[in-house]
C-alpha cells in the first residue's frame, strides 16, 4: 500500500510517500511545496491544487492521510488553513484517493510517544525509523509522520521496535466525510 501523508498549509505544504510491503514500511519520497505568497490568496489555493496534482500523478498513492484541523489562536490563520485543507481534500477526492484524517496530537503520540512533542522530535524519529540520510524539513517530516500513523495498525510497532524507539499505542484512522 502506497500512502501519501499531507501536512496542509497555505504557505508550505509538506508531503511524504511511504509504502508498506508485508510488515516493512519504506520511504519512497517526500517534499515541501513552497507556495508563492506574493500573489492573492486565491492564487495560492490554485498553486496548492496544481502542485499537489503533480505529486499525486507522479506517485499514484493508494490512500492519503491528512492532518486534521486543530484550534488556532488566530482566526484568520485558521480560516486560511481550512481553505488550504479544502483544496487538498478536493484534489485527493477528484483523483479517487481514499482519505483518512488524523489530529496532530495523535500523530505526535504515535510517532514520539507523547502528543505535545516538538517538530524536531518528530523529524528525529522519522529520520531514524526511515533511515533517511538527513532530517527532512519540518513540514515534510510531519507529512511522513502522518503517513506512518496511517500505516501504524499493521507494522509500525515492528519498525519502531527494530529501530530501538519506544513503541506507541496503535492509531485508528478517521475517514474524511466529503458530502
Swiss-Prot record:
Keywords: Cytoplasm, DNA damage, DNA recombination, DNA repair, DNA-binding, Endonuclease, Hydrolase, Magnesium, Metal-binding, Nuclease. This is Crossover junction endodeoxyribonuclease RuvC. Coiled coil: none annotated. The gene is ruvC. Binds 2 Mg(2+) ion per subunit. Gene3D superfamilies: Ribonuclease H-like superfamily/Ribonuclease H. Transmembrane segments: none annotated. GO terms for molecular function: crossover junction DNA endonuclease activity; DNA binding; magnesium ion binding. Mg(2+) 1 binds at residues 7, 139. The RuvA-RuvB-RuvC complex processes Holliday junction (HJ) DNA during genetic recombination and DNA repair. Endonuclease that resolves HJ intermediates. Cleaves cruciform DNA by making single-stranded nicks across the HJ at symmetrical positions within the homologous arms, yielding a 5'-phosphate and a 3'-hydroxyl group; requires a central core of homology in the junction. The consensus cleavage sequence is 5'-(A/T)TT(C/G)-3'. Cleavage occurs on the 3'-side of the TT dinucleotide at the point of strand exchange. The keyword Transmembrane does not apply. GO terms for cellular component: cytoplasm; Holliday junction resolvase complex. Disulfide bonds: none annotated. Pfam families: RuvC. Belongs to the RuvC family. The keyword Metal-binding applies.
